[in-house]
Amino acid sequence: MYPLLDRIEIPAQLRTLKRNQLPQLADELRNFLVESVAGTGGHLSSNLGTVELTIALHYVFDTPFDRLIWDVGHQTYAHKILTGRRTGMARLRMQGGIAGFPRRDESEYDAFGTAHSSTSISAALGMAVAARLKGVKQHAIAVIGDGAMSAGMAFEALNNAGVMDANLLVILNDNDMSISPPVGALNNYLAKLMSGRFYATARRAGEKMLGVVPPVLELAKRAEEHVKGMVTPSTLFEEFGFNYIGPIDGHDLDILLTTLNNIKQLDGPQFLHVVTRKGKGYKQAEEDPILYHGVGKFQPDQGIVSKPSAKLAYTQIFGDWLCDMAAKDSRLIGITPAMREGSGLVRFSKEYPDRYFDVGIAEQHAVTFAAGAACEGLKPVVAIYSTFLQRAYDQLIHDVAIQNLPVVFAIDRAGLVGADGPTHAGSFDLSYLRCIPNITVMTPADENECRQMLYTAFQLDTPAAVRYPRGSGPGVQIQQEMQTIPLGKGEIRRQGKQIALLAFGSMLTPCLEAGDELDATVVNMRFVKPLDQELVATLAAEHELLVTIEENTIMGGAGSAVMESLSSLDKNVRLLQLGLPDSFIDQGDPAHMLSDCGLDKAGIIQSIKERFSL
């Protein structure tokens, strides 16, 4: 079924193939990708778009000696298949299986771990400089998408790399434009010319010679820019100190191989612009690459078949609230750093296009942009994943909290996220938020509470964060009428004896189950900041043991807030803190992951019985 692919376990075997065999290999690899991802779920569109580029890179460069770094990393399935992990694709993103992103501890071919965007150029530059200092003739290659290139970190790295004169190759994987046949053919020819040794040598010699005659040098430079500017996007990357080549067709193996072989002979920073098509080779993914960006299991001959869910996802609850709130208050604006679909802003973007702002992969900018808007009387709502808010921590403190501005942070993917693993888990937000002055931090336990907490946050004139998990809640009916929740007040959901379970957010459901068996008091704490200290004091006076349960790291989290509150009381009460351990938790089924952390009914009961004789 896969005659060429079956012969390849490592790139060294790939390099034994003849060039005219590589198009067939690309077809086989693409077919295998569709079949494999259909059986496991995962990222599809981006991987189908990088098949030829992946083959060409491993064919031309001596990996793993030459360092190959994939930005974001969700487009690395072909890379994993060609580097000894084809059989592992059957357990892609599953517990004990291979990761959906590059991991250094998984393969020597994964030179750098990635999952968040725009880090590849910085990492590759560090490796290139290290090779130079060690006197090693080694190539460092960063493959970065056009979306990731919009982030400030990518341009910081380009700015630094241009003056380092290291052997760095940056490949821009541009899948947001198309090449018309005549322009494409001319660009392909010019790419061969500009990546050749003769052109590079002549260019450097000309710069040295004309450098002694500044007016002539400037005239020559402008002439070169004028000619190249007619057929290439711009000379922006030349201004950073790179030799710019392209754009070229990223699905034409002949031009890819020729260009990469030429670049391999050059010294200094090189920039190759390739144009690819997301979903290439699979009709459904080509027609709707966003739908097929991240997929569950499906039948390849049918494609994705939408199935209505019995429960609303928290993401949809947020999106519906945002539209309802926007209808009531014209000051509301919605901001997302390139996560319209993932954060639930599709409907809002269509109904309120003038109040919707997708700022690109620019989390730092998103937060300060919101702060500026808040200064002028608007009410910004920043929809962001917990793991990505980490990237804007200084802006959160310096630009929002210190100025006490009314910005609402709708924090999705709080806690464990399943198949995406530790790079995308929201394990730390309670810890890194609660230590910031002026901010209110809320943790809804169900669907209706999420809606009402978002409304409560919006009514405040100070910064506020509502953090909610991936997926759906326990199935509580949503009250359409919006009401504020008393600030900093928890609620007792079950009255028991001896033991009090203080649940934060998603942990209320397993705590209620455990509480029934233990005959324990169960409290929905609701707020991490301000903490309901009066309730904590009452619970401490009436119980022998308090147990805090949170889907956040134990260190510095909600349990720590309770412990700090207890330290000011003259009460002889024991405290047990349950939460995520001081380690990065690998991918898996969310329910199994929580069970492994002791955050289900059985785990909570077992932890209490192991620690205390009750």
UniProtKB/Swiss-Prot annotation:
Chain positions recorded as thiamine diphosphate binding sites: H74, A115, H116, S117, G147, A148, N175, Y282, E363
Superkingdom classification of source: Bacteria
CDD domains: TPP_DXS, TPP_PYR_DXS_TK_like
Pathways involved: Metabolic intermediate biosynthesis; 1-deoxy-D-xylulose 5-phosphate biosynthesis; 1-deoxy-D-xylulose 5-phosphate from D-glyceraldehyde 3-phosphate and pyruvate: step 1/1
Keywords for the protein's UniProt record, in alphabetical order: Isoprene biosynthesis, Magnesium, Metal-binding, Thiamine biosynthesis, Thiamine pyrophosphate, Transferase
Subunit note: Homodimer.
Protein name in UniProt: 1-deoxy-D-xylulose-5-phosphate synthase
Origin species: Nitrosomonas europaea (strain ATCC 19718 / CIP 103999 / KCTC 2705 / NBRC 14298)
Gene giving rise to this polypeptide: dxs
